[in-house]
């Protein structure tokens, strides 16, 4: 309906509309805020009237910054098309005419008292005077004419006044007839009553609605906005809508029900959908916040958002969230206790800044319990100081329906997505979600019952979900965090997990499809993902990126802050990209690998079986093993391995087995074409060909097993004159040693290579001696990490030349400068060119050292010595000999004599 189109109008970019030939404030123009002004330009531009300033100026909003030159226009009043809008227009018209009745009546009374007889007498006197004197005839005639004109004008004015009075009375009678014909309950009748606005019509705020008493049930009222003052703030009204009255009592929930004494109003919900603003929630346009600077307009939405959640659950309504930032200052948790559908927008942000940081270890920002089905989409959750859990899943209902999280982003909590109770998983799907920059794990999902060996949860599926940049900071294991105890350390038999990106325990039918597991920007973690006691776990097409391995010195973890972990467990702190422990059914295929700098890309351990590994696509050379099987029992080996690493740049090993059970039938373990293994090439610049397969302690039982499994197919058939075999082993304090099952006379071995993974100061020395059959020393040397030179470009290697006639090799790692700290980060290993040759890795602690010797053809004799309770240090190499290589034999012999004399070594 066009209300006004006189003149022309132009609009500036700030929404100022200027009129030419307009009278926008005239009484019957009916222009008011909310009307639509349409400019008949090309293209047509539209805006909403916010304020009528004058006859020639209007302030408009929602203009999109458009600039319109002076043109024809039309002002529309959209709500005139409704009964209530039409009623308001008619009422204003009626009030106008009623306001004019007094003016019209005054005019009528004036002309009623006008002295027409005196006017006539005056005319007659003028005529008589004219006849008496001809000289004044012309003047008299003129006077008579003027008098006659005045008489006629007066008569016309009287008639006009009469007509106006009749017209006003007729209009009033017609409008009254319309009102009378509409019936007693019409909007017009109610508006015409003195208390009409109080009974029905439009109310400005939810608070005012509570005080608006209806006359009976079933009355309607329009709520303009949840809060007053929206126009003054130059904002659009939010939270408004239609309400219906009821006589009785109900609980006021702050959005759906507005209750007063003996009555209440119920919101009309269209399409089973409502907004958080219907409950008084507010957003700001502030972008994702600076954690140290809070905006001045901070508004705590906790109670209102919880009420909105409750309505969505109880009525099965969809809750719509707006673009903008919702702030939450209360430490209370937002709780979802049933099926729910929440839909945000790409710019929807939840920012958690609790004033009372009660218990960050257990508190959650959002807790989902009893939610067997539903969908939560497009929410970005932030916290200001790594508080509690982002979204916590707690005791889901056990049926076959599922909960879907879609485009949900969790950032800067302690944990991102967290499930920490048994039997609370029920078909959860994560679609395009992200957990980033959380203090511990981005994804921590554990559905584990004591005594349950493998996962028993309902399916958990991840599709294109990103988990990156999470994990503890470099000081997270220090004394500052004594109160955290074991909250981020998980011990899995012989490996501990410190701050991985994602942790899964006790799950069934898990799929991680696409997406990313990455350590982007995070301090070093042990792994990207740790998977333990799961059943049927699949990783497919996922980016595995950017991890260096956690390198914190073992002294950072003490019994003061972690009182249930023995220090000797902390030995795998270089980690792996993916750690799989005690799983029944594991498959990883087609991952994209980039910047992986851990001991292993995939580490299988502790009775993991029914696994399949393959399809790797590395972007660059891997530093160490592609995958590593550690301690897999004989009856658990049923994997199929398809590396498909043709011409890929790998690290030291493509496949590594460590601590395998004896009598392993290795021929049934790897089902692969030879070409898929031997196409590997070493990293650029390396003079030493990389190992194809790495074995260690207990891996091979006899030469028959060795020949059947690998020797012919994988170590000797590549037409390379030198194919090294890398020997590697890890020790705990209580168990070390082993036997060599295949070796060759030392006079056939030309070189021994010694490697370290840590370049420390000269506090430690690796010593090595070559002895003849009588035990006489033929050659000896020692090496500090600083001695490792660039002779062989592989970082951390030195070469020891084996002299002719050598029958025994003695080696060890000893303290050389009364070092009282820990040397846990020292790892020593060795291999020999052309022949299979076994050495151990040694990690020397401040209270424990090892000294070993190798004597072909079939045994390794390992002796250990221990200095009790950290009170006595290992015998030190004299300072005068610390850099005197020529005196190494005397030093070693003196050291051996001291060790034997103190009972630390056998004879």
Curated annotation (Swiss-Prot):
Region feature (Disordered): 137-169
Key words, A-Z: Degradation of host capsule during virus entry, Degradation of host cell envelope components during virus entry, Host-virus interaction, Viral attachment to host adhesion receptor, Viral attachment to host cell, Viral tail fiber protein, Viral tail protein, Virion, Virus entry into host cell
Name this protein carries in UniProt: Depolymerase, capsule K2-specific
Family: In the N-terminal section; belongs to the Webervirus depolymerase family.
Organism: Klebsiella phage B1 (Bacteriophage B1)
The protein's assembly and partners: Homotrimer.
Subcellular location: Virion
Bias-annotated ranges (Basic and acidic residues): 145-155
Function text: Functions as a receptor binding protein (RBP) and probably mediates the attachment to the host capsular exopolysaccharides. Displays a depolymerase activity that specifically degrades the K2-type polysaccharides of Klebsiella pneumoniae capsule, which allows the phage to reach the host cell membrane and bind the entry receptor.
Domain of life per record: Viruses
GO CC field: virus tail, fiber
Main location: virion
GO biological process, one term: adhesion receptor-mediated virion attachment to host cell
UniProt comment concerning the protein's domains: The N-terminus contains an extended triple helical bundle. The central part is a beta-helical domain, which forms a negatively charged cavity at the interface between neighboring monomers. This cavity may contain the active site. The C-terminus is formed by 3 four-stranded beta-sandwich folds.
